[in-house]
């Protein structure tokens, strides 16, 4: 009964204002890993969700590359977006492994946020193992104030108010660890998250396994679609089950003790110090699936 009620309460179309959410990652699949479940929840509730990859992913493979790989990854991203049910998955043509927080890329981000009329913007934290992740995080921070400045990118109308900017979760602790200000249960949507990641064939079943052990590990990856998805499902669920004591406190805050104790899979977000500084009431309005 709990899961039936919990699922219906999150998936029923919201009668409130439709929200515009844009998640900005460095590569096709970044947003899917860190926000895919919550994005699917927003989409199921009738809100407008866009994923934006700042690079085309044309370097992320052990045996393919260049334009052919970029085209492959763009199509994988489109397929992932369809699986998640989001409105749009856009991949820019900046080269993978070469992303810089340049003025040109900043302007791309400013225009994208404005054109989506974003209420919520998600990005990487600017401290990460991958230079593209770091620079993607920095360029979103650099754009955070400029989205309301009329004389910057005057070809796109400025936003009337600053959106809520959020950091997607990572495991790095220096200079400080991720702070789980908002923790969302994705129990009733985890299969859609897996479907979205499953669409990134070149990454889930080729490139990422290879980076963890080369051809020896790659040879152990299942070859049939069903076995691959089962293999991926186990890993995504393990990754989504990282509920430590701090995240549990946040879950209790947003869902109440009884519901929070039953949550198995989550995604976690940190409120950035830039842009809108929300009250708890604001967060519940912007994350309607959190309402008790």
Language-model segment annotations:
Residues 1-16:
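Bacterial Sec-dependent N-terminal signal peptides
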Residues 105, 132-140, 161, 189, ...:
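Internal, well-ordered alpha-helical segments in soluble enzyme and binding-protein domains
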Residues 61-64, 176-180:
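Short acidic, glycine/proline-rich loop/turn micro-motifs
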């Amino acid at each position: 009964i709990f899961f039936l009620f919990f699922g219906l309460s999150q998936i029923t179309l919201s009668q409130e204002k439709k929200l515009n959410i844009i998640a900005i990652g460095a590569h096709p699949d970044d947003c899917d890993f860190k926000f895919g479940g919550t994005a699917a929840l927003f989409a199921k509730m009738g809100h407008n969700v866009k994923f934006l990859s700042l690079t085309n992913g044309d370097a992320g493979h052990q045996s393919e590359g260049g334009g052919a790989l970029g085209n492959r990854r763009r199509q994988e991203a489109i397929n992932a977006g369809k699986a998640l049910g989001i409105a749009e998955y856009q991949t820019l043509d900046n080269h993978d492994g070469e992303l810089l927080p340049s003025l040109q890329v900043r302007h791309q981000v400013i225009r994208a946020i404005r054109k989506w009329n974003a209420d919520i913007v998600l990005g990487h934290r600017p401290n990460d193992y991958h230079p593209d992740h770091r620079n993607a995080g920095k360029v979103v921070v650099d754009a955070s104030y400029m989205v309301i400045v009329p004389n910057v990118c005057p070809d796109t109308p400025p936003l009337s108010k600053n959106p809520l900017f959020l950091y997607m979760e990572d495991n790095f602790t220096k200079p400080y660890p991720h702070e789980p200000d908002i923790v969302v249960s994705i129990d009733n949507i985890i299969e859609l998250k897996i479907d979205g990641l499953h669409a990134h064939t070149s990454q889930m079943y080729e490139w990422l396994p290879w980076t963890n052990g080369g051809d020896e590990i790659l040879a152990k990856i299942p070859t049939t679609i069903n076995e691959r998805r089962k293999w991926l499902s186990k890993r995504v669920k393990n990754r989504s089950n990282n509920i430590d004591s701090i995240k549990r406190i946040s879950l209790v805050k947003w869902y109440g003790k009884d519901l929070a104790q039953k949550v198995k899979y989550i995604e976690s977000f940190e409120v950035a110090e830039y842009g809108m500084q929300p009250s708890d009431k604001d967060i519940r309005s912007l994350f309607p699936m959190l309402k008790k």
